[in-house]
Amino acid sequence: MKDTLALLQKFNAHPDSRCWYVAWNPKGTLLASCGGDRAIRIWGREGDSWECKTVLQDGHQRAVRKVAWSPCGNYLASASFDATTCIWKKKNDDFECLTVLEGHENEVKCVAWAPSGNQLATCSRDKSVWIWEVDEEDEYECVSVVNSHTQDVKHVVWHPTQELLASCSYDNNVCVYKEEDDDWECRATLEGHTSTVWGLTFDPSGQRLASCSDDRTVKIWKECQPGGGQDTAWKCVCTLSGFHGRTVYDIAWCPLTGALATACGDDGVRVFKEDETADPDQPVFSLSAHVPKAHSQDVNCIAWHPKEAGLLVSCSDNGEIAVWNYQSEV
C-alpha cells in the first residue's frame, strides 16, 4: 500500500459520550455531529482546524443517532432515540427547530433527504421506513409507511439523482423502494449478508450500492435490467471479506474519486480503491490505506468531504472526531 491516510486533526466533539454520526453540508463548509449527549454540534473551519460554531441541544430527550443536511444546505434533520426527527432551519449562524416529526413507535435510527429536497425518509427500530413530503411552507406530511423489513431498520439512503430509496436492517437484508401510484413499495430485496446490515452508500453514478455488515464484509450490488418490463434487479457483483476484524458500521463512497471508506468496530478506518481495468460486472477492490487504531474505540461513521478530494472525517464511541487526508498514488 503506497497510498496514505494521514491524520490532520482529532478533537473531542462529544465529551463523556459517544459520537454517533458526522455529516458535511453540501458545500463542505460546515460539519454536523451528534451523540449520546442529546446534542448536535456544528463545526466550521478556522484556518487549519475545526471549531465548534454552535450547539443544538433542546430538540431531543435522548441520544441523537443521525443527522442529515438538506440538498440546499439550509435545513438539518436529526433522528433520535426519543422516536422523533427534528427539522432545524439555518438562520445566519444559528439554527432553530422548525418542526418535530412524530409517528415512529421506537428509536429513529436514520434520516435522509431525497436529492430534490422535497422528500425525507426516516427509519426506526419499529421495523418501518417512513417517507415524508415537504411543501413550500415547510410543512411536513407522511405520505407512505413501508414495512418491508422484519427487524430494526438501521439506515436509509437515497439514490444520488433518482427518487429511489434503499434501507438496511437487523434482518440481514437491503430493500430498494420506488414510488408507484402515489405509494412507496419495496421493489427489490437484496439478500446475501449473514448478519445485521449497518450501512449503505451509492456510488456517484447511482448504478451500484455498497453495503456493510456485522458479518465483517462489504458487498457491492449492481443494478441490472432484466428486460421484459420487469422490475430492476440488483445483483451482488463483489464481496470484500477478510479485511475487517469486527462489525463494519459505516461505509462511504467518495463522490469525487470513487474511493470507498469504511468505519469498523475494530477501531480502524480503511480506504479501498477500485481496479479500473477490471470488468465492471466483476469489479475488483483492493485495500488502499488502513489506520488500525484510528480511534481508541469503535468507529461509528465515516464521511468524505463533498468538494475536497481525499478529505474525510470519522467519529467514535469515545466522543472524538478525526479529520483525515487520503492520498492515492496513481
From Swiss-Prot:
Q: Where is the signal peptide?
A: none
List GO terms (cellular component aspect): cytosolic [4Fe-4S] assembly targeting complex
Q: What does this protein do?
A: Key component of the cytosolic iron-sulfur protein assembly (CIA) complex, a multiprotein complex that mediates the incorporation of iron-sulfur cluster into extramitochondrial Fe/S proteins.
Q: Where are the WD repeats?
A: 14-53, 59-98, 103-142, 148-187, 192-231, 243-282, 294-330
Organism encoding this protein: Salmo salar (Atlantic salmon)
InterPro entries documented for this protein: CIAO1/Cia1 (IPR028608), WD40/YVTN_repeat-like_dom_sf (IPR015943), WD40_repeat_CS (IPR019775), WD40_repeat_dom_sf (IPR036322), WD40_rpt (IPR001680)
Entry similarity comment: Belongs to the WD repeat CIA1 family.
Pfam families, sorted = Beta-prop_WDR19_1st, WD40
**Claim: Transferase is one of the keywords in the record:** no
Q: What is this protein called?
A: Probable cytosolic iron-sulfur protein assembly protein ciao1-A
Question: Tell me, how does this one assemble?
Answer: Component of the CIA complex.
Q: What PANTHER family does the entry give?
A: CYTOSOLIC IRON-SULFUR PROTEIN ASSEMBLY PROTEIN CIAO1-RELATED, WD40 PROTEIN CIAO1
Biological processes, Gene Ontology terms: iron-sulfur cluster assembly; protein maturation
Q: Which UniProt keywords apply?
A: Repeat, WD repeat
| UniProt keyword annotation of Repeat present | yes
